[in-house]
Amino acid sequence: MTGAEYELYYWPEIQGRGEFVRLLLEEAGANYVDVARLPRNRGGGVQAILRALRGELGPHLPFAPPVLRAGDVVVAQTALILHFLGPRLDLVPADPVLRLWVHQLQLTITDLVAEVHDTHHPISVDWYYEQQKREARARARGFTADRVPRFLGYFERVIDRAGGPWALGATFSYLDLSLFQVVEGLRYAFPRTMESLAPRIRRLGALAEAVRHRPRIAAYLASPRRLPFNTEGIFRHYPELEAPARSPKRVAR
């Protein structure tokens, strides 16, 4: 145990799926430690993650990071970790129906993130990107032309239906943090696609900018705790995976 109220176990050199959890913890001002980023002599490094995956944190075996420990509770899977933390850190409404709605939307983000990953690893996670480049080009073509407009258009309609400025209308929640991360990641990975789509997802873009300027998030983004995007994480920028600029399909209304 590190003495922190929350211990996050995730790969120390990438944002990845763990970044959704980091953003929530940062926004809440939570007492947490990113365990694998500690020195090895303090229990950090990749070995910390391997200990978690061996079940040394509790009675249940996680499949993969991120893993969160809060006292005697150990939770894995990004969406479930957020579902667990949201009520504890006052980042989700008390209404159980709204909590389910937020969880549903977060699971939709999980689907999107999986599709982002498959643009650079469409065949096998065990192969290098260079071994599946041709297939990645085909996968990314369909993703940028069809799937990005579909997902982001859906979230645009969610915000519009709620009346904005947040996904739940006037109520800020951890879902808004996750939407920010999605927009940031897609802007990094597929900048031309996002630029051409921007006029049709104005509410989502405004939400992302509002999250960026929240005091704790702004401080986090300016700190070394916020790892940069790179070609090891979920959102990767390979210029060859983005076709020359053209208008994506119209956002469904």
PLM region spans:
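Short, contiguous strand/loop micro-motifs
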Residues: 7-9, 194-195, 219
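Generic, ordered loop/turn and secondary-structure boundary motif
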Residues: 21, 76, 92-93, 113, ...
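GST-like fold's C-terminal all-alpha helical module
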Residues: 97, 104-213, 253
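GST-like domain detector, emphasizing the conserved glutathione-binding G-site
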Residues: 2-139, 167, 238, 245-253
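Long hydrophobic alpha-helical segments typical of transmembrane helices together
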Residues: 203-253
